[in-house]
Amino acid sequence: MCKDINFSISQGERVNICGKNGSGKSTLLKLIIGNNISHTGTVFAASNLKISYVNQDTSSLCGTLADFAENNDIDQTQFLTILRKLDFSREQFEKDIKDFSGGQKKKVLIAKSLCEQAHLYVWDEPTNFIDIFSRMQIENLLKEYQPTLLFVDHDKTFCQQVATKTINI
C-alpha cells in the first residue's frame, strides 16, 4: 500500500498517479472521491468540491444512451456530441449499452464525466479497453475541455501526452 503521499492539484492540471500494480493507486483515488476505506492518515479536499469519477468497471452499464443520460442527469445533446467525437455512429445511439464493447463502454463513462460540471475529474484507467485511435480522440477531448484531472493509467504514451504532473507512489 502507498505511504507518505502529499500532493496538491491546481486548477487546470492533469495529474497522473504512477505506481506498480497493487501499490494503492486506485485505492487512493477512491479515498479522494470519498469512499469509506480503512486507512491511516488524512485526505483533505476543498469544501464543496464537486468530483466526477470514471470507474475501471463498466460491467453494470445498460440501457440506451438516452436513458443513461437521463438517469445520470446530464445534457443528452452534449453527451451525444462528445460520443460523436469519440467515433460513435448514430446507429449506436439506439443500441443497448450492455451490447457495446469494453472500449465503447469506457467512452460512455468518459463522455458522461465530461458532461458533469465538476471541479475535479478523477479517472481510473481511462484507456482500459481503448485502441490507439480512440486514445488519441480522448487526448484531443482533454485538450478541448481542459478539465482538472487526477488519473491512473498504464498507457505510458497517454500519460506522457496528457499529464502536466506525475506523482509516483
Region locations from a protein language model:
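ABC ATP-binding cassette signature C-motif
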Residues: 1-169
